[in-house]
From Swiss-Prot:
Main location: plastid
Residues where [2Fe-2S] cluster binds: C82, C87, C90, C120
Function, as annotated: Ferredoxins are iron-sulfur proteins that transfer electrons in a wide variety of metabolic reactions.
Similarity-based family: Belongs to the 2Fe2S plant-type ferredoxin family.
Name by which UniProt lists this protein: Ferredoxin-1, chloroplastic
Cofactor note text: Binds 1 [2Fe-2S] cluster.
Organism: Oryza sativa subsp. indica
Cofactors that this protein relies on: [2Fe-2S] cluster
Length: 139
């Protein structure tokens, strides 16, 4: 056999091919270990601006981390109680951007459509601006 076997005809296994998708704010490639070996997974990180009674604060939130959890990690004091998406203590109002709060069970469809959010069960899906400390306005 000649040494010409390696050429442009070599195909990568499906696990090594890169799929194209719309570019989020930031993308990180993180190793994820499992029993079958190491794999790579894409993780988007978004700019989240929180408008609190004490002023505005901005943070970077990965798309698989709840906004409340990341705020606490960065020392930002936000209200919460159940941390299960079943009360209104952490309620806020989305001013702009997209979030995924499909895990919560307190807000009804009309409230979600009106922009209400429970930060304890909200993932960013784009850059987002949220007014916090809004429980009294919701009830």
């Amino acid at each position: 056999m000649a040494a010409t076997a390696l050429s442009s005809q070599v195909r990568l296994p499906m696990s090594l091919r890169v799929a194209t998708a719309p570019a989020p704010a930031r993308v990180s490639v993180l190793p994820a270990s499992n029993k079958l070996g190491d794999r790579l997974r894409m993780q988007a990180t978004y700019n989240v601006k929180l408008i609190t009674p004490d002023g505005e604060v901005e943070l970077q939130v990965p798309d698989d981390v709840y906004i409340l959890d990341q705020a606490e990690e960065e020392g930002i004091d936000l209200p919460y109680s159940c941390r299960a998406g079943s009360c209104s203590s952490c309620a806020g109002k989305v001013v702009s951007g997209e979030i995924d709060q499909s895990d919560q069970s307190f807000l009804d469809d009309d409230q979600v459509a009106a922009g209400w959010v429970l930060t304890c069960h909200a993932y960013p899906k784009s850059d987002v601006v949220i007014e916090t400390h809004k429980e009294d306005d919701l009830i």
